[in-house]
Amino acid sequence: IQSILENIGIPYTHSGVIASAKAIDKEISKKIFIKHKILIPKYIKYSFDDHFTKLIPKIKKKFGFPVVIKPINEGSSVNVYICNKSNLKNKLKKLKPYKEILIEEFISGREIQAAILGDKKLGAIELKPKRKFYDYEAKYNSKAQTRHIIPVDLSKRKFNELMSISCRVHNLLGCRGVTRSDFKFYRNNFYLLEINTQPGMTKLSLVPEISVYKGINF
């Protein structure tokens, strides 16, 4: 979309073409994060041309179950599933149209998301979804009853660490405007799940909520 807008001369907000492309491609962004020593969940890429019988041993060797399966290029947690060994095959069928997907180790712990606005560390929010995780329904359905906790209960040192990682990731990809980085906080470590260059701006969305808490109206 950013490329189309640039070609027809229409200004737009948030990140440009290259940063947006890097962020939406989870494999590319993960490689960048690994190169710069950003802690992320272990993962493998799976092609549906590969034999499924080889996948289970590969997962067990790499990180074990449960796992998270997800498309390489999607947003809003569309077609993201937490799987164990017994239901992995059935869940994979739902992602077959993508041809290639990512399979990640499942990191338990607290779900915390942090927002950057330009060169400012805007703030963070913790999520406690009633569902298994903060999926599409939890994000966009008011009946999902996800608890939003702000301010986040972290020490000043850990909060500063969280915001520094978020700012670093924002800059590594060359982002501008607003970004939101999604983390799991487990055993005193922040695991970066992904960065969103077009974070939601609905009534249930997180960046507006963080902004209002910081005294910025949307």
Role assignments for model-derived ranges:
Residues N84-K158, F185-Y191:
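Phosphate-binding site of ATP-dependent enzymes
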Residues A21-G109:
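Active-site nucleotide/adenylate-binding loops and adjacent lid/helix of ATP-dependent enzymes
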Residues I1-I24, L39-K45:
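A short, GP-enriched loop/loop-strand-helix hinge that lies immediately N-terminal to
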Residues L5, E105, A114, H170-M201, ...:
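Conserved metal-phosphate-binding beta-hairpin within the catalytic cores
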Residues A144-I149, K158-T179:
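Internal helical hairpin/lid segments
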Residues K132-A138, T202-I210:
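A short, polar/charged loop-to-alpha-helix boundary motif
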Residues P41, G215-F218:
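Short, intrinsically disordered, charge-balanced linker/junction segments flanking boundaries
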